[in-house]
Amino acid sequence: MKRLKKAALAVACAAVLCSVFSGCGGDKKDTAKAAPAEEKVLTVYTARSESLNNLVIPAFEKETGIKVNVIVAGTGPLVKRVASEKDNPQGDILWAADQTMLDSQKELFEKYVSPEDANMIDAAKNKTGYFSPAFADPTVFIVNKKLAGDMKIAGFDNLLNPALKGKIACGDPANSSSAFQVLMAMLYAKGKDGDPMSPEAWAYVDNFIKNVDGKFLNSSGAVHKGAADGEYTVGLTWEDPAATYVKNGADVEVVFPKEGAIFPGESVQIIKGAKHMENAKKFIDFMLSQKIQEAAGKTLTVRPLRKGVKLADYMTPQDTIALFKNYDEGWVAAHKKEVVAEWNKHLENSRQ
């Protein structure tokens, strides 16, 4: 009996010791502090259109319960803001620009490739790890059908038609991002063996400058408006405003050049050191999702970049558009200054 009492006492003492010291199994879980949950907010810097912001952001808030603080400004000011705040980031997402503009400033962004990236068209994959193309502003011609009549305007060769001399609206690639994309499309279309810097590519540019009559517009908006209003027969622009005219019943046609189009992806990226990292990842996943990509394709005039998305009837079907297979956005980003300098040289020579 005494032995049993001693054994019971030993067990009781051991139990007390276990409750005092952390050496017994299972206590580490109880004493470890749980990581604080990320607050359900997200700050988005966006240069996108009001219609696109209104499509994406309220839907994201509703689906996730995450409150989005929206800061709207132009692309340039937003990129400068991200750079100025790099030591103490105030934003989580930059929804502006594309790889061409941002590639030299990768250090301002976090690497993140969404699981949805696998569902995007090949030309819109996140190849760098930083920039997720969501929608595109492809290079197009907006043709005034009344002025064009029976004239064929299907590709870059047609733009050298003497009947179009002085009747082509185009911005200055040195001052307009959309005009720069038009220039790159020309160079890839007419370059020997697809080399955008070949003499053949720039010979085409010289002839184009002559047919434009050396007059390049200062406003990108004046390009598509000039064609729609009948001031010019054709304008070299981007799809969103051109498709808007078609949607609204204007007597214009959107033409994707037969040689190929450039699909600069309006990308979305996470700001380096974002305070709401997991929420930012959810935002990118949501933007690339079937739900949002298809909603944009059916109701807006921006081009979604997810495979198999249905489009409104005023949009050009994806399978009828030729894309440059050798277009290298990384190369363009690295050589933009060189291309613009060459453009300026050819433009200056045309005026002598």
Language-model-detected regions and their locations in the chain:
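Short, low-complexity disordered leader/linker segments with a strong preference
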Residues: 1-41, 350-352
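Short, polar/charged alpha-helical segment
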Residues: 42-67
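Extracytoplasmic ligand-binding site segments that recognize negatively charged/polar headgroups
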Residues: 46-53, 73-77, 83, 89-231
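A ligand-binding cleft/hinge motif common to bilobed small-molecule-binding domains
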Residues: 100-105, 228, 233-251
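Short beta-strand->loop
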Residues: 110-118, 130-132, 157-160, 250-262, ...
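Periplasmic-binding protein-like
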Residues: 123, 137, 204-209, 216, ...
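Mature extracytoplasmic/periplasmic domains
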Residues: 261, 266, 271-327
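Extracellular/periplasmic bilobal clamshell ligand-binding domains
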Residues: 313-352
